[in-house]
Structure formats: structure tokens, C-alpha cells
Design a protein with these regions (language model features):
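Transmembrane alpha-helices
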Residues: 1-33, 132-139, 368
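Transmembrane helix-loop junctions at the membrane interface of multipass transporters and ion channels
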Residues: 9-24, 114-128, 144-146, 176, ...
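Membrane-embedded alpha-helical segments and adjacent helix-loop junctions characteristic
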Residues: 25-88, 148-219
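Alpha-helical transmembrane segments of multi-pass membrane proteins, especially transporters
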Residues: 31-34, 51, 55, 59, ...
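Juxtamembrane helix-loop transition segments at the membrane interface in multi-pass membrane proteins
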Residues: 44-57, 91-100, 178-184, 218-224, ...
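Membrane-interfacial helix-loop connectors
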Residues: 75-80, 84-112, 117-139, 206-243, ...
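Cytosolic, long alpha-helical scaffolding segments
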Residues: 97, 123-127, 254, 258, ...
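Small-residue-rich segments of transmembrane alpha-helices in multi-pass membrane proteins
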Residues: 138, 159-171, 269-278
Length: 612
């Protein structure tokens, strides 16, 4: 409702401004070019983010000072603390960093955003910046026309900087032209009232433009043109700092509880920093005068003094809040808790994660592991095995002769509660992420899609297998009980082996171990088929029992095969970007069948097709 009212209102105001004043055209065009330049730079930096994010994060955020530095450097490069905040929320939602690390990055981003004020005040207003914009645009477009993704990324960055420079130029001209017709300082509000009113204006302007950097640039150019008093400009800078948290809050709406906690930490930091700046405005002004004099800033150079003030109160905010990061983490974790839901929901997927392909891939990889953990319980219970038994070290062969202990479970109900929503969300997320990602991510997203589909197929095979297994594994016929217990042992063994593979850091070893499991599984299939043939020939089971064993043997092969495919796909999806997926290390299906044949004698007709 608010959006439907706000957009037409903005169009009406802008249209009237364009009709009433040519200077307003320059000013509005400057803001538009500046914001568009920021969008172009964001697009360019996203291209360079792929493939190195997790390695950079692990090396750059393992200590608090590194997290702060990461925030400072990334915001200085991107010139957008809002973008850094949203990306950090996506990192946290995907569990690529912890909450304390995320808070450190946010604090650093607030320091990094002060560099924008220095660039505009110290460079943008003192040289003919439009002269630099044109070559940047020309070279940027030239790079954009290349086929290489890296060149395109560089092109977006150069074009973005060019539009930023043009935006500053038009804003400066717009305010200079206004000075000939109207003195905006007549609307200045002195004292505490002025501080509060212009702080609010700064918040609103930042929310509307979704950029504190744009608000500060507008403030500095107005101050340089004499259209804004120094005191009111300080209040606008404070408001811009507080207003930038709105973008982080919006970015956290689709995030999990960790992302929401980080957005809350961002809000707390900026609110505290803004409150301290307002309360201590007089002492801060004295500090600004002292620092300005010490570094040689002229007494009437209010634009550079504004940059000093902006840096000073952000530094004070960081100094005040850093000692309380752990306290803040504890408070946020105790007061912001995930909702208790009847149906399990995705934990790691968020809209913010879609901004960067590698973050999106990591998020859906973790969500697929979450789905598999839920499916693990359903499958184990579906074949009457306790999770603790499967994950333990007891010899599962001991289960062959004893009647199964029934586990009461409604697979349809548990599927709806624990699997369905996560599976649907994963498939949708993969489709959206793959559509926006470069081609080099396609194989890994495809592997994750296959893993999700195989998990669901394994659960469905379990449901079919359970119908007879639930009867025969505890029945009086010892032959049928033993063979159905053999199905249970085979499923439990594969679940246990896959659990061990997840602890294996060496991907090559994991792939070779997976081939070993496949060989053992096919060998067990061959052996089971021979036993069924023997039981039929000797008349120890009825034809109806034999049919059940044959059909349920097929379901067991389907179930085990799907689980092994899931394991393989997850190994491929976890392969670091830029490395080979390791297909050359794996045995082909014919090789596996030949090895199994050598272990168990001549293969039965059709066994290889069954395995496939």
C-alpha cells in the first residue's frame, strides 16, 4: 500500500521540479547518476567475488581485528556499507561466518563508509571531476563489450566510477545554480531542534535513496555551495549513518534467525553511535576543530571538517561497542530465537544469498545436508533401525537372525513435516541461483539438484520397502526374517558409511571409498539373488514370498543406489570452485560390476542393469 502511494508521489514531485527549475534537473540527474554508478560498481564487484569468497572469509575473519579490517577494506572498495551489510547477512545465513565475525565486519563497514566523505570533500569538489568521468566511461564500455566475465566485471566497475563522478559533478552544479536564485540556509534550524530535525531528514533521505553515501555526497555538495549550514550538515551525516541500517533490516527479512540477529546488531550499533554523536555534539565539534587544525585543514573548509566529524563519531562508536561484542552476541541469541514450527523449514536459504553465486551454492549445499539429516532419520526408522545404532559401532550383522524391534513411524506424515518444505525450497532456490550464476557454477548446482531429488527418491523407496519388511523382519519364517534383516543391514551399513564419508576431508579418498562401497553393495546384491534362487529351488519359501523378496530386493537396490548417488553429488558440490570435480578418479559402472563379479563368481543376467 505504501509503495503504491510513494512511487506516484515521487513522480509528481520530480515532474513538478523539472518543470519549475532547470537547476533541479541538474541536481536530480546528479543523484540518479550517482545511484546508478553505485549499482554498476556492485555488479562489477559481484563478478570478482566468485571462487574466492570462502577462502578469503576464513583467512580474513578468524580474529576480531581481521573482521574489522575486512569490513573497512570491502566498504572502501565498494563504496557501499549497505551492500556489505546485506552480503554479510548472506554469509551468516549460510553459516560461512559466525555472528561475532559478522558484527565485526559491520563495525568495519561503518568505518569504511567514511572514506566516501573524504573522497567527495577532498577530491570531488576541488577538481574538474567530469574530466575524469568521460575516459572512465569509454574504457568501461570497451571492457563491457568483451566476452570475458572478468573484463566485464572490470568494465562495470569503471563505468560505475565514471557515473559516480558525473553524479557528483551534476550535484555540485545544481547546488551552485540554486545559490544564484535562492538561499536554502534561510531554512536552517539552529540548536537542538535543528539537530533532531535534520537527523530525521538524513534518515529519511537515506531510506529513500537506499544509500548513506548518496546522502553524504548530497550533503557535502550542498555545504560546499553554501546552501546548508555546517551544524545542519553534521545532523544530516548522523541521520545518514542511522538510515543505512534500514537496508540491512530489509535484507534480513528473508534471512534465517542468524541474519536477523546481525541486522539487529547493525541497528543497535548505529543507533548507539547516532545517540552518542547527538549527545556529545559540542565535545565532538571541539575535537573536530583540534584535529582539523593539526592536519592543516582551513578554518572555513567545512566540507573536510564534515568528513573529519563523520570519521570521528564512527571511530568513537566502534571503540565504545567493540568490548561488548560477545555480550551483544549472547543477548541477541537469548532474545532473538527461531520460531518453533511444526514443519521443519529451510535454515540457510535467503534472498541475500542469491546476490553472490558462491554464497548461494554454499547455502543450498548446507540446506541439502540439512535435508539429508532429516531423511537419514526417516530412512533408518523406516527399516526399523535406531539412529543411535546406525551411527554407533555395533556390528550390524548381529541383526540378521533376531526379530526386528518395530519402530512406529508414519512415513507420509514425517515426509510432510521434515522433508517436503525443505526439498521444495531447495529446488526453487537452485533454479533461481543457477539462472543468475556464471556457467562455471552450473555443474555444482546440477549436482545439488540431483542430490535433493535422490534424497526424496530414497525416502519413497523406503516407503515401498517398509510394507513387507515390517511384516517379515519379525515374522516366524526364519528364512524370510533373515533375508529382510539382510535388507535392513545393507541399508544401515550404507547410511553408516556415508556418515563416515562426511568426516573425510580428502575428496579423492572419499570418492575411492564410495567406489569401494558400491562394489561391496553390488556384491551383496549378487549374493542375495543367489540365496533367493536357492530358497526357491529347495521349496523353502512360497512363490508369493519369493515375489516379495525379489520386488523388495529391487527397492533396496534403488534405496541404496540413491543414497550412494547423494553422497557422490555432495562430494562434487563441495569441490572448491576452480578445481576439477574428480570424475576421473571414479570407477565406471562396468568396472564396478566386473569387480563385484570377480568377488562373487559369475554375474546373474541383468544384474548390471538392476544396479543402474
Amino acid at each position: 500500500m505504501l509503495g503504491r502511494i510513494a512511487l506516484p508521489s515521487i513522480f509528481i514531485v520530480l515532474s513538478y521540479g523539472f518543470w519549475a527549475s532547470s537547476s533541479f534537473k541538474d541536481l536530480a540527474a546528479g543523484v540518479a547518476l550517482f545511484l546508478f554508478g553505485m549499482l554498476c560498481m556492485e555488479q562489477g564487484f559481484k563478478v570478482f567475488s566468485g571462487g574466492t569468497i570462502q577462502r578469503v572469509l576464513s583467512a580474513s575473519t578468524d580474529k576480531l581485528w581481521k573482521s574489522l579490517s575486512f569490513g573497512v577494506v570491502s566498504t572502501t572498495l565498494m563504496q557501499s556499507s549497505s551492500l556489505v551489510s546485506v552480503i554479510t547477512i548472506s554469509f551468516l545465513s549460510a553459516e560461512m561466518i559466525g555472528l561475532a565475525q559478522g558484527i565485526g565486519i559491520i563495525f568495519g563497514a561503518n568505518l569504511g563508509t567514511t572514506t566516501g566523505a573524504w573522497i567527495v570533500a577532498g577530491f570531488g569538489l576541488k577538481v574538474n571531476i567530469s574530466a575524469y568521468a568521460m575516459p572512465l566511461l569509454v574504457f568501461g564500455v570497451l571492457f563491457l563489450m568483451q566476452s570475458s566475465a572478468r573484463f566485464k566485471g572490470l568494465g562495470w566497475i569503471l563505468v560505475g566510477i565514471g557515473f559516480l563522478f558525473l553524479g557528483i559533478y551534476f550535484m555540485k552544479n545544481g547546488f551552485s545554480a540554486y545559490a544564484q536564485y535562492i538561499d536554502l540556509t534561510q531554512y536552517a534550524i539552529p540548536g537542538i531542534k535543528g539537530l533532531l530535525v535534520f537527523t530525521l531528514i538524513g534518515i529519511v533521505a537515506t531510506v529513500v535513496m537506499q544509500s548513506s553515501h548518496a546522502t553524504l555526497t548530497l550533503t557535502i555538495t550542498a555545504l560546499a555551495a553554501g546552501q546548508l549550514t555546517y551544524e545542519n550538515a553534521l545532523a544530516l551525516a548522523i541521520g545518514a549513518n542511522v538510515g543505512t541500517t534500514i537496508t540491512a533490516i530489509l535484507g534480513s527479512i528473508s534471512a534465517n534467525i542468524s541474519g536477523k540477529r546481525l541486522a539487529a546488531a547493525h541497528l543497535i550499533f548505529n543507533m548507539v553511535t547516532g545517540a552518542v554523536a547527538l549527545v556529545m555534539i559540542k565535545p565532538l565539534l571541539h575535537c573536530v576543530e583540534f584535529i582539523s587544525g593539526a592536519v592543516g585543514i582551513a578554518a572555513d573548509d567545512y566540507t573536510l571538517k564534515l568528513a573529519v566529524f563523520h570519521t570521528l563519531f564512527n571511530v568513537i562508536g566502534v571503540v565504545l561497542m567493540v568490548p561488548f561484542i560477545n555480550t551483544m552476541v549472547s543477548w541477541l541469541e537469548s532474545h532473538l530465537k527461531g520460531a518453533s514450527v511444526e514443519y521443519d523449514q529451510p535454515r540457510y536459504l535467503s534472498e541475500a544469498s542469491l546476490e553472490l553465486p558462491e554464497v548461494a551454492q554454499q547455502a543450498v549445499y548446507k540446506e541439502t545436508l540439512h535435508l539429508f539429516d532429516n531423511a537419514f532419520s526417516l530412512i533408518a526408522h523406516g527399516v526399523d533401525l535406531r539412529r543411535s545404532l546406525v551411527r554407533g559401532d555395533q556390528d550390524l550383522q548381529e541383526l540378521l537372525e533376531a526379530p526386528a524391534q518395530p519402530i512406529k513411524i508414519d512415513l507420509d506424515d514425517q515426509y510432510t513435516r521434515m522433508v517436503k518444505d525443505i526439498y521444495s525450497a531447495n529446488i526453487e532456490f537452485i533454479s533461481r541461483a543457477q539462472a543468475a550464476a556464471p556457467s562455471e557454477f552450473a555443474e555444482r548446482f546440477a549436482a545439488l539438484r540431483r542430490a535433493n531429488m535422490d534424497i526424496v527418491a530414497a525416502i519413497k523407496a523406503t516407503k515401498h520397502l517398509r510394507k513387507n519388511l515390517h511384516v517379515y523382519s519379525r515374522g516366524i519364517d526364519k528364512n524370510m526374517r533373515r533375508e529382510y534383516n539382510r535388507f535392513r543391514v545393507r541399508v544401515g551399513s550404507v547410511l553408516r558409511e556415508i556418515g563416515a564419508l562426511r568426516e573425510q576431508d580428502d575428496r579423492v579418498v572419499a570418492l575411492l571409498s564410495l567406489d569401494r562401497i558400491k562394489v561391496e553393495t553390488l556384491d551383496a546384491d549378487n549374493h542375495a539373488s543367489r540365496i533367493v534362487d536357492k530358497l526357491i529351488r529347495q521349496g523353502e519359501i512360497s512363490s508369493q514370498m519369493a515375489t516379495s523378496l525379489i520386488n523388495d530386493g529391487a527397492y533396496t537396490r534403488e534405496l541404496v543406489g540413491r543414497l550412494l548417488d547423494v553422497a557422490r553429488d555432495l562430494i562434487q558440490a563441495s569441490t572448491p570452485h576452480g578445481e576439477a570435480l574428480g570424475d576421473e578418479m571414479s570407477l565406471q559402472i562396468e568396472d564396478i560390476a566386473n569387480i563385484a563379479r570377480s568377488l562373487d563368481g559369475a554375474a546373474l543376467p541383468g544384474e548390471m542393469e538392476d544396479y543402474q
